[in-house]
């Protein structure tokens, strides 16, 4: 059975901390280096629900994509929700390790996992990492479809293949337009529009798209935009990371039991569609 320090060394080889953005907070948050690890849980968010899931599972290590403390704090009191997470982890001898922007740009990384979930063929990074001479690392991925789809069909595929959320998939653009090439980026993606336009793709699937960036992007060209829930676009990475750690465990004879969280931590819990006619309450006259 490996020690935590050995497992962390393996995770750091997959997602080196030095490749994280300067503002990010990655690495081991809680954990005793010499503690033994037999069971690991991967999740998107280090929130109480996933920590409780780790406790119930008997996990020794929780690996999350999002940081617990992205900004500094002066307290880990259990009266705060993040402090309660820390207390629960320590009381149950569960370590917490975070791989965030260093997993976004990895090869394979968050957007590779998203592309794989949608059966897209990855061509190259959307925003290449200049430090990678092979040009395989970077933010987002430019992809090709094996067979053309309409925007509507691509959105339906995303709704079917990604974890279900209240939001589903929002679309901007002609639903019947043909899509042969797609850019994808797990997590917030509306800062990447210049790169998407430069890539010359037919569609862009990401999360957290806002009104003004979408309006301006649509004014530039007829690019189709597909907006999924942030959590849903990053959850496939949990399966990828778990598979990678499984392979490492087998290679070293660690016999780790690696699990992927099924807890939905997307903060949106319901969706009510607008009335279809202009006579709906609140519609313009």
UniProtKB/Swiss-Prot annotation:
InterPro entries linked to this entry: DUF34/NIF3, DUF34/NIF3_sf
Species whose genome carries this gene: Streptomyces coelicolor (strain ATCC BAA-471 / A3(2) / M145)
Alphabetized GO MF terms: metal ion binding
UniProt keyword Transferase, yes or no: no
Family annotation (Pfam families): DUF34_NIF3
Quaternary structure note: Homohexamer.
Gene3D superfamilies: NIF3 (NGG1p interacting factor 3)-like
Protein name: GTP cyclohydrolase 1 type 2 homolog
Highest classification ranks of the organism: Bacteria, Bacillati, Actinomycetota, Actinomycetes, Kitasatosporales
NCBIfam families linked: YbgI_SA1388
Family: Belongs to the GTP cyclohydrolase I type 2/NIF3 family.
């Amino acid at each position: 059975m490996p020690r935590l320090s050995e497992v962390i060394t393996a995770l750091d080889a997959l997602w080196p901390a030095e490749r994280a953005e300067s503002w990010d907070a990655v690495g081991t948050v809680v954990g005793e280096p010499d503690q033994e690890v037999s069971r690991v849980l991967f999740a998107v968010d280090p929130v109480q629900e996933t920590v409780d899931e780790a406790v119930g599972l008997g996990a020794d290590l929780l690996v999350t994509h999002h940081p617990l403390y992205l900004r500094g704090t002066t307290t880990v009191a259990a009266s705060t929700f993040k402090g309660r997470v820390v207390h629960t982890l320590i009381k149950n001898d569960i370590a917490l390790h975070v791989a965030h922007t260093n997993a976004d740009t990895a090869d394979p990384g968050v957007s590779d996992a998203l592309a794989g979930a949608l059966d897209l063929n990855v061509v190259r990074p959307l925003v290449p990492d200049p430090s990678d001479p092979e040009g395989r690392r970077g933010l987002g991925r430019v992809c090709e479809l094996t067979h053309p789809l309409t925007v509507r069909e691509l959105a339906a595929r995303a709704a079917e293949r990604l974890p279900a959320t209240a939001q589903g998939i929002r679309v901007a653009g002609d639903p019947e337009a043909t899509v042969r090439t797609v850019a994808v980026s797990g997590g917030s993606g509306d800062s990447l529009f210049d790169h998407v336009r430069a890539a010359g793709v037919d569609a862009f699937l990401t999360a957290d798209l806002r009104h003004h960036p979408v309006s301006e992007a649509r004014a530039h060209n007829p690019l189709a935009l597909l907006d999924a829930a942030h959590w849903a676009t990053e959850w496939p990475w949990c399966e990828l990371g778990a598979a990678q750690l499984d392979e490492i465990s087998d290679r070293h004879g660690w016999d780790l039991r690696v699990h992927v969280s099924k807890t939905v931590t997307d903060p949106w819990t319901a969706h009510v569609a607008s009335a279809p006619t202009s006579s709906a309450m609140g519609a313009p006259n």
